[in-house]
Amino acid sequence: MLLKNIKYIVALIFIFYQTSIYSKSTSLEKFDGNNFSKYFSGIVALENRNNSDALDFFDSSKSLIDKHDPYFKKYISSLILENEILKAINLIKYNKSKKIINFFEAYLLLSIDSIKRNELDNANEYLEIAFSFIDNDTINTAILETFKQYIFVFKENKILDNQKNFGNLSLISKTFQKCFLNDSRTDAHFVNLINDNEADFSRYIFFYTSYLIEN
């Protein structure tokens, strides 16, 4: 049950996170010509949202991992956008002792991995580190606060009081939290979500159907 809910959470967060992952390119240091060309092409492809091409270029210039810190962050971003989450997590864990993982996405993924392993205290610790990299970014703040709420639900089997309100994300999140807890009002929350007149939440009919089948 926990693993299934993690899949829902990751899918939910991915929808919101995709809108904020593209960033301006960082100044380039001197590399050998071949790696420079591939790295630069990867940056251009990523900023043009050609995610598959970007990942190919970054894959072919992995020797830059220990030479240029911004490369690793862009490589991880391209993996996320291509839904290669497990590969991104494994790369981050492998390079965990290095300074190159000092960015928001790295600790968010480490937290997700810890939740999947039911290591909830570790997940909280990684979230606290991730908070130091949000730079007043509203979307990243919403993502981290939402994950904190889920971790609390998994640990305490109840919903956190005085949750911060992030609009539609909070509405969706609270519905899934009630679903996890088998709350008697889950049906009503799904119905309200699907029938919301201010936004199209029809994609959540699938989750509601799955909930009805399981119950």
PLM region spans:
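Residue-level signature for tetratricopeptide repeat
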Residues: 44, 77-78, 113, 151-152, ...
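Internal alpha-helical scaffold/solenoid segments in large eukaryotic proteins
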Residues: 51-52, 56, 202-208
